[in-house]
Amino acid sequence: MAKKSDLIYLETNVYEEGLKRVEQIYNSHDEVWISYSGGKDSLVCLKLIEEYFDREGITDKINVLFRDEEIINNAIREFVLTFVDNPRYNFRYYATQLDSEIYILGEKKTLIQWDETRDWIVEKPDCAITLEGIHDQFTFDKHIFGNSNRRCCTILGTRADESLLRFAGITASKVCHITKNPVAKNMTIGKPVYDWHEKDIFKYLYEKDIEYCKIYDHQIFNKDPLRVASAVH
């Protein structure tokens, strides 16, 4: 078993490495999208992409995709909507029927997000894109990108220290920041902040004076985990 003394420290930091990974992702794919959640981790990914575009003088719009899961906290929805009309982004806001699962008091139940056979918890924003039929959330990417011959990457704000499952999934890949997407052969998943800690995330947001979703302030006050993820799976 590896010991702490076996660690090899590099003369770099996660910020510099994050920018390098963003550059590698864009240089090795035909099409790149960031899957934005409104949360702190994907927000950092988005801002790293902006930094990369600015440094390289890239004038293309940044492809941003958001999936509104209907039962998300409204503070998250309102925060995400502030990005929709930003001229820097090609922003796709999806609010469509997705077959998913939710756990209520330890019991697993089926939930169709934005089910057209019932009243919705909240009305869809005017900018929302709705696909025909009901889709599975794990094949959503395939429906959007899987029919293309282009090499596509979806960037996620996944971090290894969030859970052992995520740590195992990241370290199992030969290239930790680019992993295969099991949904389609032409797709990969980019994880430029996989080795960032939560303190690194907030340090970056603070030093760059970047506004984040205010739900985190409430969670800190209540001593809750700092997450924007909904209860659906």
Stretches with model-predicted labels:
Residues 1-35, 40-233:
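Nucleotide-activated chemistry modules centered on ATP-dependent adenylation/adenylyltransferase
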